[in-house]
């Protein structure tokens, strides 16, 4: 396998100010705080008002540029993972290029749709492209306006999701210890379990069964590819779907739950934004370089795991 030595130069995140609590849901649905919390671990979620996935992606990208005073003129690749763009074309990535004032540059910009696995997919694509030598700096974003595609009368799905965006700037590293490893995949025979038509639909029990099976498997597979053990990993950043799922994965792997970073109590499931958002949130408070596993799953089904130094 070709080595992919990359470094995360900077990260950024954005969530709308407007917060919807479980008690707020109890006023519009047959539910309550205890019911939601015990089943999901979610207490609050941020809901965009007058903003789209494009706006949130831009704000997260700008934070990533500003956090390290990064020279945005170096960026020559932009990849956005999202399932909630308000427009079919141009891509969110293309619009971020414009908002960053990079219109004069020869930049490759495109979106991908891999649902909640999207950011991990996008990082592997970016790593491969910059490692080819044809690109020098990749801006990778996960941005989701999930509230725009929810059925607000369906308590099984409406309570789960929030809006947010997370971004990372990636460059090639000259340190061989910065090799990145990936184990991504998909299957097409379960497309009727989690889908959007035109609102989010989900067979919750089947999604849970898939998630608790594929996430430990993905972690083990990516560790195997890297020639590492779980003891070589400082922490795991899982997709923030549901506390019970993460708890089950930790139990399956015989790991303390503290090894898994979480913020779903505050933000809920933000799909492709959840992993980069949590990555930036953690790095803000812990700037020292750590070796992490990113792991997620999503509609399709899709799944992805990555080992990175961040």
From Swiss-Prot:
Pfam families: ACP_syn_III, ACP_syn_III_C. Pathway: Lipid metabolism; fatty acid biosynthesis. Its EC number is 2.3.1.180. Residues 240-244 are annotated as: ACP-binding. The active site is at residues 116, 239, 269. It catalyses: malonyl-[ACP] + acetyl-CoA + H(+) = 3-oxobutanoyl-[ACP] + CO2 + CoA. One of its GO terms (cellular component) is cytoplasm. GO terms for molecular function: 3-oxoacyl-[acyl-carrier-protein] synthase activity; beta-ketoacyl-acyl-carrier-protein synthase III activity. It is found in: Cytoplasm. Its main location: cytoplasm. GO terms for biological process: fatty acid biosynthetic process. Keywords: Acyltransferase, Cytoplasm, Fatty acid biosynthesis, Fatty acid metabolism, Lipid biosynthesis, Lipid metabolism, Multifunctional enzyme, Transferase. Catalyzes the condensation reaction of fatty acid synthesis by the addition to an acyl acceptor of two carbons from malonyl-ACP. Catalyzes the first condensation reaction which initiates fatty acid synthesis and may therefore play a role in governing the total rate of fatty acid production. Possesses both acetoacetyl-ACP synthase and acetyl transacylase activities. Its substrate specificity determines the biosynthesis of branched-chain and/or straight-chain of fatty acids. PANTHER family: 3-OXOACYL-[ACYL-CARRIER-PROTEIN] SYNTHASE, BETA-KETOACYL-[ACYL-CARRIER-PROTEIN] SYNTHASE III, CHLOROPLASTIC. Belongs to the thiolase-like superfamily. FabH family. Homodimer. The last Arg residue of the ACP-binding site is essential for the weak association between ACP/AcpP and FabH. This is Beta-ketoacyl-[acyl-carrier-protein] synthase III.
């Amino acid at each position: 396998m070709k080595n992919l030595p990359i470094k995360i130069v900077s990260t950024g995140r954005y969530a709308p100010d407007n917060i919807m609590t479980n008690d707020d849901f109890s006023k519009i649905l047959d539910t309550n705080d205890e019911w939601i919390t015990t089943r999901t671990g979610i207490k609050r979620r941020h809901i965009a008002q007058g903003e789209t996935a494009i706006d949130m992606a831009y704000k997260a990208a700008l934070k990533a540029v500003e956090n390290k005073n990064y020279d945005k003129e170096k960026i020559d690749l932009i990849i956005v993972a999202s399932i909630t763009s308000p427009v079919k074309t141009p891509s969110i990535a293309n619009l971020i290029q414009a908002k960053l004032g990079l219109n004069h540059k020869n930049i490759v910009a495109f979106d991908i749709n891999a649902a909640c696995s999207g950011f991990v997919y996008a990082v592997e694509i970016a790593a491969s492209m910059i490692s080819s030598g044809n690109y020098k700096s990749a801006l990778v974003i996960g941005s989701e306006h999930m509230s725009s595609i929810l059925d607000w009368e369906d308590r099984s799905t409406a309570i789960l999701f929030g809006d947010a965006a997370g971004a990372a700037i990636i460059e090639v590293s000259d340190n061989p210890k910065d090799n990145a490893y990936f184990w991504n995949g998909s299957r097409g025979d379960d497309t009727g379990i989690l889908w959007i038509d035109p609102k989010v639909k989900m067979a919750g029990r089947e999604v849970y069964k898939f998630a608790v099976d594929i996430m430990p498997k993905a972690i083990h597979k990516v560790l195997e590819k890297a020639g590492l053990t779980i003891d070589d990993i400082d922490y795991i950043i899982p997709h923030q779907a549901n506390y019970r799922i993460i708890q089950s994965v930790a139990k399956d792997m015989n790991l303390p739950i503290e090894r898994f970073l979480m913020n779903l109590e505050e933000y809920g499931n933000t799909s492709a934004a959840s992993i980069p958002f949590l990555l930036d949130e953690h790095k803000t408070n812990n700037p020292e370089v750590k070796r992490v596993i990113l792991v997620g799953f999503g509609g399709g089904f899709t799944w992805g795991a990555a080992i990175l130094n961040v």
